[in-house]
């Protein structure tokens, strides 16, 4: 697949296009230009490292939304085996914006749940652009309760702009579905490991993100509202989205400092979309260590820590005047 470059990556795009041109010439020429290609590849790598070392929060938001970034089903296919998808909330419908089912992780039975976006237009519409309806969250809860019944851990993957705000979703109890998930996940008597792999948008993300260990990929985002939405409310224009992104503190390092996540998972140079295989290998190793850690703790201790984490969200302290 030909890489898609973001606006701030245009200098990289120009180098990569030059490399492709030279490769085409080399295939049809007796001249050996492999050294020149290698030199440009090295230059492209160094430029990518330089650009990504100083990304602004708004640029990180662009990376988190990259259309070639790995989605939940990509991680499931690469990290887990024997995945059996389970469908429906047993009340209204099967929401394709949430996927989940039984799988094996290093031979151990687990329940995997996550938001799922689409690649092409047809798939994006079917998945509702990764924005779940209430039935999606109720499906997720049904699978979590099933995991509790079987005594197997739950692993969730968060990647959504937010819960779907349509009239039908509100009529079917969107806020109740999200609130119910928060309540039930806090008391679920199995280990839960959460990973924010792309966008972590508001309650739509939090509804499957209450866990014992919360990871966040290096260029993922997690916030109460999108930068564009925040700017539209505060300044009546989405053009100040970069200011909003800075103020919201949407990046993984910032959230780690605030204690809202436990670990920042390093991405390949240029983001997870540049090297799916490397990203999968890194995350699998992280999940393996964390699952072993949380499973070694008494369940009552896990529940207390999980509850305390949820109650700490939104808490702040004012400095004395």
UniProtKB/Swiss-Prot annotation:
<comment type="function">
    <text>Component of the acetyl coenzyme A carboxylase (ACC) complex. First, biotin carboxylase catalyzes the carboxylation of biotin on its carrier protein (BCCP) and then the CO(2) group is transferred by the carboxyltransferase to acetyl-CoA to form malonyl-CoA.</text>
</comment>
<comment type="similarity">
    <text>Belongs to the AccA family.</text>
</comment>
<keyword id="KW-0276">Fatty acid metabolism</keyword>
<comment type="pathway">
    <text>Lipid metabolism; malonyl-CoA biosynthesis; malonyl-CoA from acetyl-CoA: step 1/1.</text>
</comment>
<keyword id="KW-0275">Fatty acid biosynthesis</keyword>
<keyword id="KW-0444">Lipid biosynthesis</keyword>
<dbReference type="InterPro" id="IPR011763">
    <property type="entry name" value="COA_CT_C"/>
</dbReference>
<dbReference type="GO" id="GO:0003989">
    <property type="term" value="F:acetyl-CoA carboxylase activity"/>
</dbReference>
<keyword id="KW-0067">ATP-binding</keyword>
<keyword id="KW-0443">Lipid metabolism</keyword>
<dbReference type="GO" id="GO:0005524">
    <property type="term" value="F:ATP binding"/>
</dbReference>
<dbReference type="GO" id="GO:2001295">
    <property type="term" value="P:malonyl-CoA biosynthetic process"/>
</dbReference>
<feature type="domain" description="CoA carboxyltransferase C-terminal">
    <location>
        <begin position="32"/>
        <end position="293"/>
    </location>
</feature>
<dbReference type="InterPro" id="IPR029045">
    <property type="entry name" value="ClpP/crotonase-like_dom_sf"/>
</dbReference>
<protein>
    <recommendedName>
        <fullName>Acetyl-coenzyme A carboxylase carboxyl transferase subunit alpha</fullName>
        <ecNumber>2.1.3.15</ecNumber>
    </recommendedName>
</protein>
<dbReference type="GO" id="GO:0009317">
    <property type="term" value="C:acetyl-CoA carboxylase complex"/>
</dbReference>
<keyword id="KW-0808">Transferase</keyword>
<keyword id="KW-0547">Nucleotide-binding</keyword>
<dbReference type="InterPro" id="IPR001095">
    <property type="entry name" value="Acetyl_CoA_COase_a_su"/>
</dbReference>
<dbReference type="GO" id="GO:0016743">
    <property type="term" value="F:carboxyl- or carbamoyltransferase activity"/>
</dbReference>
<keyword id="KW-0963">Cytoplasm</keyword>
<dbReference type="Pfam" id="PF03255">
    <property type="entry name" value="ACCA"/>
</dbReference>
<dbReference type="GO" id="GO:0006633">
    <property type="term" value="P:fatty acid biosynthetic process"/>
</dbReference>
<comment type="subunit">
    <text>Acetyl-CoA carboxylase is a heterohexamer composed of biotin carboxyl carrier protein (AccB), biotin carboxylase (AccC) and two subunits each of ACCase subunit alpha (AccA) and ACCase subunit beta (AccD).</text>
</comment>
């Amino acid at each position: 697949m030909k890489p898609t470059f973001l606006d701030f990556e245009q200098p990289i795009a120009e180098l990569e296009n030059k490399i492709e041109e030279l490769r085409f010439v080399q295939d049809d020429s007796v001249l050996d230009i492999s050294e020149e290609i290698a030199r440009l590849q090295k230059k492209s790598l160094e430029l990518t490292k330089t650009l990504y070392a100083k990304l602004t929060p708004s640029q990180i938001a662009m990376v988190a939304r990259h259309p070639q970034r790995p989605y939940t089903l990509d991680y499931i296919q690469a990290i887990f085996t024997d995945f059996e998808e389970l469908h429906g909330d047993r009340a209204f419908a099967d929401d394709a914006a949430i996927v989940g089912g039984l799988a094996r992780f290093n031979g151990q039975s687990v329940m995997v749940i996550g938001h799922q976006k689409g690649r092409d237009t047809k798939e994006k519409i079917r998945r509702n652009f990764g924005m779940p309806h209430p039935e999606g969250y109720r499906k997720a809860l049904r699978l979590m309760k099933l995991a509790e019944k079987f005594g197997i851990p739950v692993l969730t993957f968060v990647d959504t702009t937010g819960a779907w705000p349509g009239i039908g979703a509100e009529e079917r109890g969107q806020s109740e579905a999200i609130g119910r998930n928060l309540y039930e996940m806090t008391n679920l008597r199995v280990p839960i490991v959460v990973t924010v792999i792309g966008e972590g948008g508001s309650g739509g993300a939090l509804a499957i993100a209450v866990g014992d260990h919360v990871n966040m990929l290096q260029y993922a985002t997690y916030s109460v509202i999108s930068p564009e939405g925040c700017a539209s409310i505060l300044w009546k224009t989405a053009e100040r989205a970069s200011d909003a992104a800075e103020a919201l503190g949407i990046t993984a390092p910032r959230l780690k400092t605030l204690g809202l996540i436990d670990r920042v998972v390093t991405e390949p140079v240029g983001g997870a979309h540049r090297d799916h295989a490397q990203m999968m290998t890194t995350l699998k190793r992280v999940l393996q260590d964390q699952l072993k850690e949380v499973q070694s703790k008494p369940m009552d201790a896990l529940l207390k820590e999980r509850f305390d984490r949820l109650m700490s969200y939104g808490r702040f302290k004012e400095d004395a005047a």
